[in-house]
């Protein structure tokens, strides 16, 4: 199964992605993780991406599209994949759709974790206060969180609204508990084994 998971910062995308990929036995492909890995490896791409991520801005589309295309063609994606955090705007969506055609792939569902802006902000700011391995992510400061929320509302939400009429679009109430959100996704896509 090939899934695309949409939602704002703090919507629970990462949590649901981890659950679904375990249940389905498919890789979780996160552009954020790919970019952080490049940054940790000290690559030129990672250094370039770092400056954008630290400001809460989007990394240029072509860099992301090329990375995603390469990742979707890895051997571990044969049974499917879950793509989290991409596409993020209308331009990326158009290039992404063309890229999928060029590599002869398609997606089964566009899952949207629908969470109001005020709740997204509260969740994201709470996450920033929680350290991961004793360290806060450099892109999880209150300033960059607010910037990411603004970018989401300006760039990503209009793209999601365009996808709403797509027959594969599946809105999910993301304000519910983790378990309830997972159950709602399972009910809608119908192919995930129940826990």
UniProtKB/Swiss-Prot annotation:
ATP binds at residues 10-15, 127, 176. Its main location: cytoplasm. It catalyses: AMP + ATP = 2 ADP. GO terms for cellular component: cytoplasm. Coiled coil: none annotated. GO terms for biological process: AMP salvage. Residues 126-140 are annotated as: LID. Pfam families: ADK. Its EC number is 2.7.4.3. GO terms for molecular function: adenylate kinase activity; ATP binding. Residues 30-59 are annotated as: NMP. Belongs to the adenylate kinase family. Catalyzes the reversible transfer of the terminal phosphate group between ATP and AMP. Plays an important role in cellular energy homeostasis and in adenine nucleotide metabolism. Consists of three domains, a large central CORE domain and two small peripheral domains, NMPbind and LID, which undergo movements during catalysis. The LID domain closes over the site of phosphoryl transfer upon ATP binding. Assembling and dissambling the active center during each catalytic cycle provides an effective means to prevent ATP hydrolysis. Monomer. This is Adenylate kinase.
């Amino acid at each position: 199964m090939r899934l695309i998971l949409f939602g704002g910062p703090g919507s629970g995308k990462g949590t649901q992605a981890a659950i679904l990929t375990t249940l389905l036995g498919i890789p979780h492909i996160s552009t954020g993780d790919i970019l952080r890995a490049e940054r940790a490896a000290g690559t030129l791409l990672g250094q370039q991406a770092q400056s954008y991520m630290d400001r809460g801005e989007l990394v240029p589309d072509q860099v992301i599209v090329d990375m995603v295309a390469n990742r979707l063609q890895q051997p571990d994606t044969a049974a499917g994949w879950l793509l989290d955090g991409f596409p993020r705007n209308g331009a990326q969506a158009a290039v992404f759709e063309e890229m999928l055609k060029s590599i002869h792939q398609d997606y089964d569902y566009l899952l949207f974790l629908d969470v109001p802006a005020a709740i997204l902000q509260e969740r994201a700011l709470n996450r920033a206060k929680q350290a991961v391995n004793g360290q806060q992510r450099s892109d999880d400061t209150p300033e960059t969180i607010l910037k990411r929320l603004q970018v989401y509302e300006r760039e990503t939400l209009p793209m999601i609204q365009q996808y709403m009429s797509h027959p594969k679009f599946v809105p999910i109430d993301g304000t519910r508990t983790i378990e309830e959100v997972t159950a709602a996704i399972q009910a809608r896509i119908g192919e995930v084994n129940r826990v």
